[in-house]
Amino acid sequence: MRFAQSMFPSPDQADENGIVACSRNITCEMLQDCYFHGIFPWPFGEEYQVIPWCAPLMRGVLMLDEFHIPASFQREMKKNRFTCRINSCFEEVICACAAAVRPDSGGTWITQEVIRAYCEFHKMGYAHSFETFDAGGNLAGGLYGISCGRVFCGESMFYKVSGASKFAFVKMVETLKQHGVVLVDTQMVTNATRSFGAKEIPSAEYIRLLKQYRGKPLSF
């Protein structure tokens, strides 16, 4: 798959906050361009008029050959409390991610414009969701991200029932491995992703890996 020159500045031109550019809108063309060149949008919220496009100096990644499930969560998975589906309710997942309460954040970056753009990106086959459902068939948790060939860029996750988002994460990794994916871009490293083996690497190293493994989006 050939890649045209990006419409964005190079990630190595990011400022001290990891921002490479700002725009007043977000389109599928911009999303396709940014992910395949190591950049992602991170809006401040509905009240701001510009959308920052970011390439952090340090990047959170999960190399799938280093993935492991903590023993405590292995025991939780054996309870079989959830079932997993893929792409069964993408819009519901991204809206739930937007509504999730995050104590360490002042609000959600998933604005209505972001939801609209990613739902369209999903219809184009780039954005995918992994969902967990409880025994009653209710959506209990999930996550979504972008397929860039053998790289998968995770975006956001949520849970309504404890453990549901981690269950979705594990099922996502199992699915990605089956399709030959090498790494998940987690952007940042959280306690949850660190427990599965995520780590930080310099932006330049991430870009090198991305160029090596990026390709046509996968179909699940």
Which residues does each predicted region cover?
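N-acyltransferase acceptor-side catalytic subdomain
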Residues: M1-F220
